[in-house]
Amino acid sequence: SPITTLNTNEDDVSGGLSYDGQRLLIYKIENENADVFESKLNGTKWEKAERKMGKSANAVNTSDNETLASYDPADIKIYYLTDGGYAKNWDIMFSGIMNRERNIWGKGQSAGYEVNTKYQEGSVYMHPDGKTMYFSSQGHNSMGGYDIFVSYIDELGHWGPAQNLGVPINTPYDDLFYSSTASGKVAYI
């Protein structure tokens, strides 16, 4: 049955479950604007999702659209998409936790030019190792539509060059929503 505390009359889309299973990121479209919300598991029930990440230039949620958020493995960063990025196309951003008790997140930052292109980026998945990001993009050296790429973070916190995962992962069509097991031996698309 529907989880009434999460389902509303608006468009509600789950993005990412925290690695401890206690928090869920959702994006909602209200008044033609998409924003990231978070719900917490209280015992066995999900609390009402709240936009606790702000609504200003110094927050995750801005006057642009923010969607498809997911946690990093340490649950101290979230990665999400915004249409306020380079050339007003969808770009990957991240934000770090500033105050966990009050659920205050820092200003969104671009994942950088090695990841974001002048074309649209899509879904993002952080591998459990915390150093590997899989994402979809229409840019870089896409085979057609969105392809799945991988990038690795260096010791300074910068993402390295995007690498196309190639065939059989990518096709001439849109390839999105990659995830894998912790071992990396099994992937889901």
What does each of the following model-derived ranges do?
Residues 1-189:
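Short, conserved micro-motifs composed of acidic
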